[in-house]
Amino acid sequence: MKYVLLKPKLIFLVLLVISCLFSTQSFSENVKSWKEIDRYYKKNNIDVYNLQASEIEKLKSYETIPDNFATLEDVQKKKEIFFLIAYPLIHKNNEDIKQERKIIIDMEKKGSIKDLNSEDLNSLKIITKKYKLEFTLEDKYLYKKLKQRVNVIPVSLALGQAIIESGWGQSRFAIEGNALYGQWTFDQQEGLIPEKRDPDKTHAVKKFDKLEDSVRSYMYNINTHMAYYEFRVIRRITDRIGAMDENVRIKIKLLAAYAEIGKKYVDKLELVFDSNNLSEFDGIN
């Protein structure tokens, strides 16, 4: 029997891709009540509205939303707990994307694709395939194409869409299906059928094993689907200039395709963004 030895960098990349697809994080946790979440953060003196970078390592990633969260009526407490559930998941997935992006940038510094050794070429092929691009040695724009796709989603934007799509984490889809972003599927076995679905519709809302899977799928969708090509182009341009707050506002306007209501969805997202001061979450590094 022959054994193939992989070099350290390639092993790292393979593990990274696998973890992004089938992640079972050690810091993930299941809780039965939202009060457990509340107690943990109070015990550690962590205020989600004044979160410091030094506190990020203390954040917990919850696999599911507690069943009793749907009955929490205190609006301020509901928002606080939701942010404590959603922010760590968004941060974690953005960090995974940053690692992939760094690999691409490091390779680009070495020169053209043809200058890469076999280890780097294999790594580049893995990332290229994952992000639905065609790999050829002659493509001198491949690095540019990859960097346009392999990029983070602003935390404020990801929070805003999760708020709308999951009803602050209290929707049936969020509680029963770990679905924070209302992504559709046409496989009835993979999703939950909306109770008020039009008779001529056949879609369901996709279910996930864990909340983190929902966040990862959402980010992957934004970073690869053709409907968000303009979003990705503008992200590449605006990330180089201007204040973060204004950058996010520009990007919000490019998400009309995310919902059937189009422009009204953008208006709704802008309202959620402003009324909840979501831009504050973009300043945490």
Regions found by a protein language model. Give the residues of each.
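Bacterial N-terminal signal peptides that target proteins for export
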Residues: 3-12
